[in-house]
């Protein structure tokens, strides 16, 4: 009898241990992120990824540096048309924020084990840590700030070491935002490739707390996963092209699409970028007429593919360059921006203002970090390579004035 009791006790203990271990194994985790997208003066989007289907939400605190556990915080859920999304990709757009203010935040996910009819069975939670670490923070944009500082990286094609080297050349504590100007990968075939290719590194270095604005390059249009890109970048925006203002700088971020004709055999009949750029030009025309654009001391155009120019090199007059020249540049020449920032060419090029085009076009190389510090009267532009050398540095004055090399 005693043996039977001992056997039953051991059996029950074994079952309990097994169930506990299975529960531990099956706990949901946040696999990537969180990171910031489309931060504006009164809104911000936060994105994170989980390993299991779940609902997700953000808790936001604007009450200084006290404990995050001091009081309950409002929850902002990942929803679509009034329904909480069950997904492994979560994106929450928080509105009604105050310009130039710091916010602390925490992201959550709760696994959805089963959903049938009116019955939903939930599983365990996952969240960012606010017990052993300080909560993540971000600042909303402040259009009234007297100055701003930002950096741009492009064309790293999945080279994480290069990205880390370049980002080490800037003081992130004095950087308001980061521009990724396209071709951060050579193609996109999976979510795993996107994060291992550069985004996990970006999150580790800065992207959870410093806004990152993304301009799609022609290589992000390639691969079976290319159609999914807006689930990760600008996920709560209507388009992949958009505009924002930080301090004296108003940025218009364009999506220049592919670099060859839609009919090229390389695209296998899957692209329609000529029409896409035409539709985008209509949006651009309206933005250039906006009060926000006209009132900004400095206007910067961000576009991966540079326009075709008269003195173009052998790789500056492809179809994509011509499309940018024909569909975007006529509008820009009438609106007098101060600067156009591009990538794509894998080398540094600077086309100064001419009688035809009143603003310079600066093409950053694939192995350099471009850094800009702007006040209401001038912009200082520096280009640094991964070794910290600064081959280019000059000051750019307001539109219609000249650039002075330093």
Feature locations, PLM:
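Active-site neighborhood of phospho(di)ester-bond hydrolases with catalytic His/Asp-centered motifs
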Residues: 152-154, 178-183, 212-218, 301-303, ...
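Short beta-strand segments enriched for Tyr within beta-sheet-rich domains
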Residues: 48, 100-109
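Non-catalytic, glycine-rich low-complexity segments
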Residues: 22-55
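Conserved small/polar residues in nucleotide/adenosyl-binding loops
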Residues: 395-402
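Active-site environment of divalent metal-dependent phosphoester hydrolases
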Residues: 158-162, 186-189, 216-225, 259-262, ...
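Active-site-proximal segments of metal-dependent phosphoesterases and phosphodiesterases across multiple
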Residues: 267, 273, 292-339
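N-terminal active-site segment of His-dependent metallophosphoesterases
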Residues: 40-43, 54-57, 67-77, 82-83, ...
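Extended active-site neighborhood of metal-dependent phosphoesterases/phosphodiesterases
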Residues: 108-137, 193-293, 327-331, 350-375, ...
């Amino acid at each position: 009898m005693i043996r039977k009791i001992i056997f039953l006790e051991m059996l029950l203990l074994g079952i309990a241990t097994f169930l506990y271990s299975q529960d531990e194994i099956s706990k949901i985790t946040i696999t990537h992120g969180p990171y910031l997208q489309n931060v504006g003066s009164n809104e911000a989007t936060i994105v994170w990824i989980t390993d299991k289907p779940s609902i997700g939400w953000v808790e936001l605190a604007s009450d200084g540096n006290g404990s995050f556990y001091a009081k309950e915080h409002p929850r902002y859920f990942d929803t679509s048309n009034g329904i909480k999304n069950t997904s492994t990709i979560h994106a929450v757009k928080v509105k009604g924020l105050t310009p130039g203010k710091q916010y602390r935040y925490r992201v959550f996910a709760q696994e959805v084990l089963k959903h049938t009819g009116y019955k939903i069975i939930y599983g365990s939670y996952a969240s960012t840590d606010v017990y052993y670490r300080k909560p993540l923070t971000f600042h909303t944009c402040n259009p009234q700030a007297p100055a701003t500082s930002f950096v741009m990286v492009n064309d790293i094609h999945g080279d994480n070491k290069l990205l880390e080297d370049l980002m080490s050349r800037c003081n992130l504590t004095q950087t308001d935002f980061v521009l990724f100007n396209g071709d951060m990968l050579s193609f996109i075939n999976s979510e795993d490739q996107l994060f291992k290719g550069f985004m996990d590194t970006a999150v580790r270095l800065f992207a959870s707390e410093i806004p990152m604005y993304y301009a799609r390059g022609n290589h992000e249009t390639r691969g079976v996963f290319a159609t999914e890109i807006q689930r990760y970048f600008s996920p709560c925006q209507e388009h992949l092209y958009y505009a924002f203002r930080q301090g004296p700088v108003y940025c218009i971020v364009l999506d220049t699409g592919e670099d060859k004709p839609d009919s090229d055999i390389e695209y296998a009949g899957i692209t329609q970028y000529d029409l896409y750029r035409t539709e985008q030009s209509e949006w651009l025309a309206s933005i250039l007429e906006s009060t926000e654009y006209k009132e900004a001391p400095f206007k910067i155009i961000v576009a991966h593919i540079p326009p075709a120019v008269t003195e173009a090199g052998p790789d500056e007059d492809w179809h994509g360059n011509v499309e940018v020249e024909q569909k975007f540049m006529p509008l820009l020449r009438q609106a007098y921006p101060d600067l156009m920032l591009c990538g794509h060419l894998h080398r540094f090029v600077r086309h100064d203002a001419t009688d035809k085009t009143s603003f310079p076009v600066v093409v950053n190389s694939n192995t350099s970090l471009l850094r800009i510090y702007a006040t209401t009267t001038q912009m200082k532009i520096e280009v640094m390579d991964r070794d910290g050398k600064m081959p280019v540095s000059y000051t750019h004055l307001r539109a219609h004035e000249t650039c002075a090399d330093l």
